[in-house]
Regions:
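Conserved pre-ATP/AMP-binding loop-to-beta segment of ANL
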Residues: 49-52, 174-198, 205, 227-232
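Conserved AMP-binding/adenylate-forming core of the ANL superfamily
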Residues: 50-87, 94-100, 104-108, 125-130, ...
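Conserved AMP-binding A3 loop
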Residues: 65-70, 192-218
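Conserved structural elements of the adenylate-forming
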Residues: 73-81, 208-230, 236
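AMP-binding/adenylate-forming catalytic core of the ANL superfamily
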Residues: 141, 390, 395-396, 418-502
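Conserved AMP-binding/adenylation subdomain of ANL enzymes
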Residues: 217-232, 239-300
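Gly/Ser/Thr-rich phosphate-binding loop
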Residues: 277-281, 290-358, 461
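Conserved ATP/PPi-binding loop(s) of AMP-dependent carboxylate-activating enzymes
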Residues: 366-370, 379-406, 426, 441-445
Length: 527
């Protein structure tokens, strides 16, 4: 069911009203140091108390629920109060579950408290989740139900479930009303570790990035340029990924509204109901949106995406120019941004000109003001490894000095990405240092450069360039099979090969029947 209006505010019967809580929340704000998420979230909450912060489909009542900014801040205070009463102050809390409002509430409460929160991928096996809980030394874990991980014994870890949210809020509200909350008045410091994110890049070993409060506030000006209080966005990223966490926080810097998507199976219905003005995607999701538009007139295509969509922001590998042109045909701007978990997700940003998203062709956006990006050992074209310094740079990997030293040197992140900057501080990513192929001829080839060329061929949805027997080869997925499709691709390949140096030419092209394997964040896996 997707009704025309939101029908109820979540857990509104479990907490005091915002007007009643205002004085308490003003007192709480005085305990948050300035460069903390809590300071900016509560400041914005008091500025827009009646505006919807999040909306979502409530499966229990089969309607659309919402939470206002004022209601959200009140519930954070209530949940934080009860968690502190239970001894959770200073503890590490892991979250396992699909995108839901209770997940969001627990996450934001931890972020606005003296706690460390660890989002985990709910699609992982119990064995893998157990390994990660031990690896990050979690003190407690919150899961979708009491039955989750029921067969797993992890000594010393407390368990809570999102189904207990209402009970916890009522208990916390009683503490606030009686002025017995230890959460009220407890400081949140800029330098404290508040978030730990598991990351393995595109195939490396498991690592846990430690992020401070001040790391997470660096992007606030970017979000305020990108979104305004009239915008409504659709959250598609998984919340175990730094891009999802960024979108979740970005809402609270801006006064805008974010709809928590139930997943791709509901995407068409959600687009029709939510009518988003902006959507944040990874490349695979951008491809899916194009599939939705396929064959439609401009008017019909825009209607299928809700009718109000003005822009799409891609937080992943750079998109081919052909994709940008196809979205532009429907009056939709699409830009790419660059970031990594170790920099809280954001290094570059999209520009907004006259209300429209804009970026230079081929770039992954303009470097965010206050972040220093330089190119190490650039070649004659200015191409080299991308290095990053700034307030957004992480503290290191949890209990992993070796991996920390490999990437973080004197406060500078050595990203392993190869790219260049132009005179306007726009960044262009060419490829990954570790992906560079050394051919039998001794020549170096960056596979991502050739993949960008392959994506210019019509109907190429996915591709992977790799080295085989000392030469360049490629796998291509178009969704079409047969001799005719192979011949079409080979004709296009011959044209491409004539335009590039001999050592870069693709000697073998394989048309594959299934999409390429991907990581949990949507990146194509390289062997």
């Amino acid at each position: 069911m997707m009704p025309d209006t939101c029908l109820h505010e979540a857990f509104s019967d479990s907490c005091m009203g915002y007007a009643e809580a205002t004085k308490l929340l003003e007192r709480a704000c005085g305990c948050f140091e300035r460069e903390t998420s809590a300071h900016y979230f509560f400041e914005n909450g008091m500025r827009h108390p009646g505006r919807h912060a999040y909306e979502w489909h409530d499966p229990e009542q089969d309607n659309v629920a919402y939470i206002t900014y004022g209601g959200l801040m009140t519930q954070i205070a209530a949940l934080g109060s009860e968690l502190y009463r239970q001894g959770c102050r200073g503890k590490t809390m892991a979250l396992i579950g699909k995108t839901s409002y209770p997940w969001v509430l627990f996450f934001l409460t931890a972020l606005c408290s003296d706690m460390v929160v660890v989002p985990l991928d709910s699609s992982l096996s119990d064995e893998e989740l157990t390994k990660r809980l031990r690896h990050c030394r979690a003190d407690m874990v919150v899961t979708e139900s009491k039955e989750s991980l029921a067969d797993v014994e992890i000594q010393g870890i407390r368990r809570l479930s999102f189904t207990e949210t209402r009970r916890l809020l009522k208990a916390g509200n009683d503490l606030l009303a009686a002025h017995e909350s230890d959460w009220m008045g407890t400081p949140v410091r800029e330098k404290q570790i508040c978030l730990m994110m598991f990351t393995s890049g595109t195939g490396g070993r498991m690592k846990v990035a430690m992020l401070r409060q001040e790391n997470l506030t660096m992007e606030r000006y970017v979000w305020r340029d990108l979104l305004n209080s009239k915008d409504k966005s659709l959250l598609l990223y998984p919340l175990s990924h730094i891009a999802g966490i960024g979108h979740l926080r970005g809402t609270l810097f801006t006064g805008s509204t974010t709809y928590l998507s139930a997943g791709f199976r509901e995407l068409l219905r959600e687009l029709a109901y939510v009518k988003p003005t902006i959507v944040f995607v990874v490349p695979a999701q951008a491809t899916l949106l194009l599939e939705i538009l396929k064959g439609d007139s401009v008017e019909e295509g825009r209607r299928r995406l809700g009718g109000n969509l003005r822009g799409i922001v891609n937080k992943g590998a750079p998109l081919p120019e052909s994709m940008r042109e196809r979205f532009s045909h429907y009056g939709i701007d699409i830009t790419s941004e660059y970031g990594l978990t170790e920099c809280c997700g954001g290094v570059t940003c999209s520009c907004v000109r006259n209300g429209r998203l804009w970026s230079k062709t081929g770039s992954v956006g303009m470097v965010i003001e206050g972040i220093n990006v330089r190119i190490e050992l650039p070649d004659e074209q200015g191409v080299g490894e991308v290095l990053i310094r700034g307030q957004n740079v992480f503290d290191g990997y949890f209990e992993d000095e070796t991996e920390t030293k490999a990437i973080l040197k004197d406060g500078v992140i050595h990203t392993g990405d190869i790219g260049y900057l132009d005179e306007d501080r726009f960044l262009y990513i060419v490829g990954r240092k570790k992906n560079v192929m050394v051919l039998s001829s001794g020549e170096n080839v960056i596979p991502e450069e050739l993949e960008a060329e392959l994506y210019q061929i019509p109907n190429v949805k996915e591709c992977l360039v790799y080295e085989k027997d000392g030469a360049v080869a490629a796998k291509v997925f178009t969704g079409v099979l047969g001799a005719g499709e192979e011949e079409r691709l080979n004709i296009a390949l011959r044209s491409l090969n004539r335009s590039i140096p001999g050592y870069k030419r693709i000697q073998k092209l394989e048309l594959i029947s299934e999409p390429l394997p991907k990581t949990s964040s949507g990146k194509i896996v390289r062997n």
